[in-house]
Design a protein with these regions (language model features):
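A short hydrophobic beta-strand->loop->alpha-helix junction that borders the nucleotide-binding pocket
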Residues: 80-91
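Pre-Walker A adenine-sensing motif
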Residues: 29-41
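Charged, amphipathic alpha-helical linker segments immediately N-terminal to NTP-binding catalytic cores
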Residues: 1-23
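Walker A/P-loop nucleotide-binding motif
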Residues: 44-63
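Mid-core helix/loop region of P-loop NTP-binding domains shared across ATPases and GTPases
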Residues: 4-10, 29, 92-96, 107-156, ...
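The catalytic "switch" region of P-loop NTPases
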Residues: 142, 153-231
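Post-Walker A helix-loop "phosphate-sensing" segment adjacent to the P-loop in P-loop NTPases
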Residues: 67-78, 106-107
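C-terminal alpha-helical "lid" subdomain
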Residues: 2-7, 55, 203-204, 212, ...
Length: 328
C-alpha cells in the first residue's frame, strides 16, 4: 500500500518536473540542429549567439536540448555529440577550458597551463566526436570588465573554432555580444544571432502562445479540477512580465500549497500568496491575483487554512493525480 508521504512526495516531485515546450523553444532547437549539422559538411562551422534577459529560458533551452543528445559509452570510448558547459565564476579562459575538459572526463582537467589545457581539449574534442559546443552564461567574461580579458577570450574562441571546425553556440545576456565586437573574425562567425524575448501582451500571436503555455501547464498538473490558468492569462502576464521562468515559479509554489491543502485545483488565493512570497521586492507590482485587483495596490492575500488534513485513498490501480482527495 502506498503511504501518504509517498503519494505526496510523488505529487510534489511531478510539479517540479513539469516542462512545457513551446514554439520559441522548438525554433531554437532547429537552429541548434542546423549548427550541429554544419560540422564536417560546411566549409565553415555555423555558429550561433543566443541572447536574452534573465528568465526567458536560455539555460533551460540548453538543458532540454542536451536531453536529446546524451553522451554514450561505446567500444570506441566516450562519445559526446553535444558538449555543454556553464562559464564558471570567476570567468577565466583556464576555468572555461577546465570545465569543458571535465565534461569530457579528463582526469587532469584542473591541471596545466592554458596552452596545455587547450591542446588536450582539441584532442578530446576529436576523440569524443564532439559535433557542437554550447557555452552558457557567456556574459560572465564581460562582467570582468576588462578589455584585455575580452580580447583574449575572443581570440581563444576564434582559434578553437578554426582549429577544430566544431560549431559553437554562445548563450548569455545581451552584454555577451561585446566579445564579438572585440574581434572582427569572430563577429563574422557569429553573424547568426537569436534573441529570446519575454512574451508580449500587445501582439496577438505572442498572447495566444502565452495562453497555450498556461493551458498546457494546467493540464500537466493533473489536479482533480482544471485551474483555468488561461482564463486569467492577463494576471499572469502582469505578475511575470511575460517571463516563463517567473510563471513557472509562481505556479509551482501555488501548486505545492494547493496540494498541502488538499485543494482540487490551484486557486487565485494560492497564486496571490505565491506572488507575495516568490517575486523579488524590487520587481514587485500590485498583486494581480487578488480578487477585485485593479492594478493599484498590493494587499495581503487570505491566510492559508489553519487546519489542513490529508489522508490516504485506498489503491484503485490508478496513478494518483496531483491534488487527489486522499482518504482512508
Amino acid at each position: 500500500m502506498t503511504s501518504r508521504d509517498d503519494i505526496l512526495s510523488g505529487a510534489h516531485a511531478r510539479i517540479e518536473e513539469i516542462f512545457v515546450d513551446h514554439k520559441r523553444f522548438r525554433a531554437a532547437y532547429r537552429r541548434f540542429d542546423e549548427c550541429r549539422a554544419s560540422f564536417g559538411h560546411a566549409a565553415e562551422p555555423e555558429c550561433l549567439l543566443v541572447m536574452g534577459s534573465s528568465g526567458v529560458g536560455k539555460s533551460t533551452l540548453m538543458r532540454r536540448y542536451l536531453l536529446n543528445t546524451p553522451m554514450q559509452r561505446t567500444d570506441e570510448g566516450l562519445q559526446v555529440p553535444v558538449l555543454t558547459a556553464t562559464i564558471p565564476v570567476p570567468a577565466t579562459m583556464k576555468n572555461m577550458a577546465a570545465s569543458l575538459l571535465d565534461r569530457l572526463e579528463d582526469p587532469l582537467a584542473d591541471r596545466g597551463t592554458l596552452l596545455q589545457k587547450t591542446r588536450r581539449l582539441r584532442r578530446l574534442l576529436k576523440e569524443c566526436q564532439v559535433e557542437l559546443i554550447i557555452l552558457d552564461e557567456f556574459q560572465h567574461f564581460i562582467e570582468r570588465d576588462s578589455d584585455r580579458v575580452i580580447l583574449d577570450v575572443s581570440d581563444w574562441l576564434k582559434n578553437l573554432i578554426s582549429e577544430t571546425a566544431v560549431p559553437v553556440v554562445l548563450i548569455g545576456l545581451p552584454s555577451a555580444k561585446r566579445v564579438l565586437v572585440a574581434n572582427e573574425q569572430l563577429r563574422r562567425r557569429f553573424s547568426a544571432q537569436l534573441h529570446l524575448e519575454p512574451f508580449g501582451w500587445g501582439d496577438d500571436a505572442s498572447r495566444d502562445e502565452f495562453r497555450r503555455i498556461l493551458n498546457a501547464v494546467d493540464l500537466a498538473l493533473q489536479m482533480r479540477q482544471p485551474s483555468g490558468f488561461a482564463d486569467f492569462a492577463d494576471r499572469f502576464h502582469v505578475a511575470s512580465r511575460g517571463l516563463i521562468a517567473t510563471v513557472m515559479k509562481l505556479i509551482r509554489a501555488a501548486a505545492h500549497r494547493a496540494i498541502r491543502e488538499n485543494a482540487p485545483r490551484v486557486e487565485l488565493r494560492h497564486l496571490a500568496r505565491a506572488f507575495d512570497e516568490r517575486v523579488f521586492p524590487e520587481d514587485r507590482r500590485p498583486n494581480p491575483f487578488l480578487d477585485g485587483w485593479d492594478g493599484s495596490v498590493i494587499t495581503t492575500p487570505d491566510p492559508e487554512p489553519a487546519n489542513t488534513s490529508v489522508s490516504i485513498r485506498k489503491s484503485t490501480g490508478r496513478k494518483p493525480r496531483l491534488g487527489d482527495n486522499l482518504h482512508a
